[in-house]
């Protein structure tokens, strides 16, 4: 994993335009490494058949990373056995969404980040830019590969919180805001679960072994006390693990 920028709340995520509440003239964050340095790293990996995962949060960093992935694809073709991934990618340029699909780049998000800083996106980025943050439903409509995670220890390592926030766009503790933040980007439970399981396995390049229950796969699974696909989303966090299996072997039972 490579880091290409910081975070919006500290004005270290790299933007194409300055922050709405600039701390100094031209405040638009910065890349953590020069773009040419990242380009050399990604191209060297692509030449050897390897893929790269890059931390990008601001639209400037996302756009620059996609430019590099695009050049790598032109030179060496799209990766065949693993998948380039952008991690977090919170604030995108609208035109870069379709580039994710074109380049088969995984959009790896942490749903609990949505409400980590209430009011922060509007404060730092303004209403227009904040309307295209964590666009899970749009990704699904456009055919973008998605992966979900917790980003522990930044947020708790609690799987049901991930699913709850992806489905409701509400904070897992306060349940704010009513109706969800950007409710048009809510997704159904089946999509959220798929992103969290098979999507994450795909991002890791191990979807042939992990992420779903199919003949020949590892049979890593949990048994829950209620069905996350049918339970009321507001009751989802009460779900308890009854058993855990690793490679088909029982390793935990309540």
Model region roles, listed by residue range:
Residues 1-46, 51, 97:
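Active-site-adjacent helix-turn-beta-strand microarchitecture at beta-sheet edges
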Residues 6-9, 25-29, 58, 126, ...:
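Glycine-centered flexibility motif
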Residues 43-53, 60-84, 89, 94-98, ...:
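His/Asp/Glu-enriched, well-ordered alpha-helical/loop segment
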